[in-house]
Amino acid sequence: MAGKGINIKVKRAAIIKALHDRLTEMVHIQEEYEREVEAYEKARLKWEEEVAQVTLKSIDFKTICDNINIRKGYSANNNQTNVMIDVMIDDNKLPVEPEGVKNPFRNTWSGKTYLGNYEERVAEIKNAITILNLSDEETVNTSTYANVAKYL
């Protein structure tokens, strides 16, 4: 019995409903993620402005020549010079950097199975729902269920 696989029948309607529910959940998760990314980008711009202000206030013009890097001709317009100044600032004088947002649907692997990004997963779920709706069978076999279960 150790080598014998399990064989069950799963109701097609139950799988379709579960896929619809998962699709709805994914849409809500993606919308929340997009709102969080937008808020993060605004916070990041504000943080960069604050860092620039602290940096400008921290420049010691007496010692600036020790920390200056001048490059000529590296820009698209060779009539410009790129001047970079390294300014050392204690971290405790800088504002706290906003934390990035983790993408809930980044490309990933689950064992040997590739799970794509949001768009790829939505397309796969919609495709599975379409195929399951075309079937007139009341149940589906274990292998069909296994193929769609990764999205549930």
Provide a role label for each language-model segment:
Residues 2-4, 145-152:
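Short acidic DE-rich linear segments
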